[in-house]
Amino acid sequence: GAIAAIKARHMTAGEGEFLGLDREEARRRMIAGRTLIEDIIGAPVAGFVAPAWLYGPGARTALADVGFALAEDHMRVWAPDSGVVLARGPVITWASRSRGRIASSLVFSALARHALAGLGVVRVAVHPGDVTVPSLLTSIDRTIGRLLQSHQAGRYADLLFDRDRKKYATHCG
């Protein structure tokens, strides 16, 4: 909706590609992307994350069509086929495109690594450009170090295992 469009315009550098796609185009791109990544890594992918975590209605519908086991946005990880939420809460992430984004990333991550530590699942997203900025790399190290005091590192596929065991999952309303 309107909030996603505002995010795409002001919070990204044009990465909201899946925001305006219809179902068929989103489906085509998801299949092509999955094939490419699986060919590169030699293993199946666990799920799909839209650029900038922005999905339009067509992309949300295509997720279940394509058969991705999970998807994520800024606030949750869910199973597209059922709507079951596998993890809820904001993702800790950094932005390296400008001094202002670097500064806001440092402030948010410092607060989030402590404030979110009580959640059952805390997600951390690192982009390739983030590791080229020394202050962000230090922040990433501190964040992961702090979270490893109370959490075990895992993969998205682990959330699917937990779902099958009925752990963490609540139905998306």
Region spans (language model):
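C-terminal domain-boundary segment and adjacent tail
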Residues: L70-A71, V121, V126-G173
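Well-ordered, non-membrane alpha-helical segments in soluble/globular domains
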Residues: M30-I31, S104-S109, L137-R146
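Catalytic domains of cell-wall/extracellular-matrix polysaccharide-remodeling enzymes
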Residues: E17-T93, T132-L137
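A conserved mid-domain beta-alpha-beta active-site/ligand-binding segment of alpha/beta enzyme cores
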Residues: V85-S135
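A short acidic, often aromatic-flanked loop/helix-cap motif at beta-alpha or helix-coil junctions
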Residues: W78-P80, I92-R99, F161-D164
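Aromatic- and acidic-residue-enriched carbohydrate-binding clefts of CAZyme catalytic domains
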Residues: G1-F18
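A generic secondary-structure signal
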Residues: L36-D39, R113, R146
